[in-house]
Amino acid sequence: MWMRKACLSVLLIGLFSSCGVLERGGNYIPAEKVWPKVKKEADKYGLDPAFVYAGCHAESSLDANAETSVARGMMQLTEGAWKDVTDKNYRLAFNWETNVEVGVGYLGKLKGMLNKVKKFSYPRLAASYRYGFAALRRQGFLVSKMKTPKNRIYRKIFAGNIRPVKTPSD
């Protein structure tokens, strides 16, 4: 009888965890800690740190434990994007500092791809990050042809406001 109960317990835990009932708790990192890290990483790639900071807010509201079925961490990186820029294990995506390093590295890679085709702009960079470079290319690099994001921060960036979130230094 105890074996049946133990098996049922394991089955229920597996079922609930796969349905998202048992989730990681939020791990919201204070803006005052995130901002210096974002500035440091953005500078490495010649990116506007306020744009990157807005992306962190848009993706996770600065939650290091943010997770969807396909993306992890503060910058909501997919495993494919992660592997495009680092050999580090994807399990590290929940470490907010590593996630910012890799996420900004991925933004830097996308910036390089846009520069190569002479199409760089911050709205295009955001669209590439959100929907993929290939999806933007299929639309002739016209952000206006991309699906309008539900997220208000992304909507502002797509419309040309590349600094829609107040930074701690503002």
Mark where each language-model region is.
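Bacterial N-terminal signal peptides that target proteins for export
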Residues: 1-7
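Hydrophobic h-region of N-terminal signal peptides that target proteins for export
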Residues: 12-19
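Cell-wall polysaccharide-cleaving catalytic domain and substrate-binding groove, primarily
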Residues: 38, 42, 51, 55-86, ...
